[in-house]
C-alpha cells in the first residue's frame, strides 16, 4: 500500500499476512514492518486486505495511530466479514477506520462488491460507497473529538501488554 502526499512525500507498507488460499505465500514475501505515518497532525497506519483478520497486528498500543486505512480485494462471499471486522477494528482500537475495497470481477472470475466505508472510533458508520459502484466516500474526521473520547473512555490503558514475534524470526 502507498500513501502519497500533495507535497510529494511517499510512504509504503508491505502486507504482513499473505493470503495462502490465493497462493500469495508462493509468490510474495510478507512484510515485517508496521510504519505509522505522521501527516498533518494525524498518525496513520496502512494495512492491506487479509491483515484485517489479524487484530493483534493492528493493535493500537498506547494510541500510536489515529486512523487505520485498509485497502483490499475482499470478495463477495466474505463481504459480511469485511463489514464486521472493520467496525470491530474501530471499536477495539478507539480509532477512525477507513476500508477501501474494489468492485468488479478479477481474472479468476472472483466477484467483488466494494463496500468502502469510514467508521468512527465509536463504531458508527460515517460514510460509505454503495455496493457495486465506483465512488468516493467523504467524512469529516475530527482529531479533537477522537482525543476527547480517548480521555473519557481510556480502555486502551487496560489492554494486555504483548510483543509480536514473527514466524520467520
Could you say what each language-model-derived stretch is?
Residues 1-3, 35-36, 116-118, 136-139:
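Short beta-strand scaffold segments in enzyme catalytic cores
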Residues 15, 39, 121, 131, ...:
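Active-site donor-binding loop signature of nucleotide-sugar glycosyltransferases
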Residues 38-40, 91, 169:
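RNA-binding accessory domains that recognize and position tRNA/RNA substrates
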Residues 138, 146-169:
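Short, basic/aromatic-enriched C-terminal tail that caps enzymatic domains
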Amino acid at each position: 500500500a502507498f500513501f502519497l502526499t500533495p507535497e510529494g512525500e511517499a510512504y509504503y507498507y508491505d502486507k504482513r499476512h499473505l493470503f495462502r488460499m490465493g497462493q500469495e505465500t508462493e509468490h510474495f514475501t510478507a512484510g515485517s514492518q508496521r510504519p505509522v505515518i505522521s501527516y498533518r497532525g494525524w498518525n496513520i497506519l496502512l494495512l492491506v486486505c487479509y491483515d484485517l483478520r489479524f487484530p493483534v497486528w493492528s493493535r493500537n498500543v498506547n494510541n500510536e495511530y489515529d486512523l487505520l486505512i485498509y485497502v483490499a480485494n475482499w470478495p463477495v462471499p466474505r463481504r459480511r466479514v469485511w463489514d464486521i471486522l472493520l467496525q470491530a477494528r474501530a471499536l477495539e482500537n478507539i480509532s477512525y477506520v477507513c476500508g477501501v475495497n474494489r468492485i468488479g470481477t478479477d481474472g479468476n472470475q472472483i466477484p467483488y462488491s466494494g463496500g468502502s466505508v469510514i467508521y468512527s472510533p465509536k463504531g458508527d458508520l460515517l460514510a460509505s460507497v454503495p455496493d457495486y459502484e465506483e465512488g468516493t466516500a467523504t467524512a469529516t474526521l475530527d482529531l479533537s473529538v477522537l482525543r476527547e473520547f480517548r480521555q473519557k473512555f481510556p480502555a486502551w490503558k487496560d489492554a494486555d501488554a504483548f510483543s509480536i514475534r514473527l514466524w520467520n524470526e
